Amino acid sequence: MGDTIRADEEESGDAVTLALLALGWLLSDGDRASRLLALTGMTADDLRQGATNPRILAEFIRYLEGYEADLVAAADAIGASPAQLVNARIELERRT
């Protein structure tokens, strides 16, 4: 599978890792990335800074939850289940 990182290749499967993988999936497509920025009002700088903030990472997953097709596609692309992403969001929210 080349250089693509998948959740099933991560030993920990930790919430931050899953959120970052999902964010990477979101940003890997120009249309999806543009939609994320337009709907959230975030800038590219906001995204970079948010990548270290558990609350913001949780919001990226919540954003995916708002459109089930994207949640399922992201989970599939990163080798996780939609439930794992939702659980990661819950864990990240606990950290805030």
Model-derived regions: residue spans:
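Metal- and O2-centered redox machinery and metal/ROS homeostasis
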Residues: 1-96
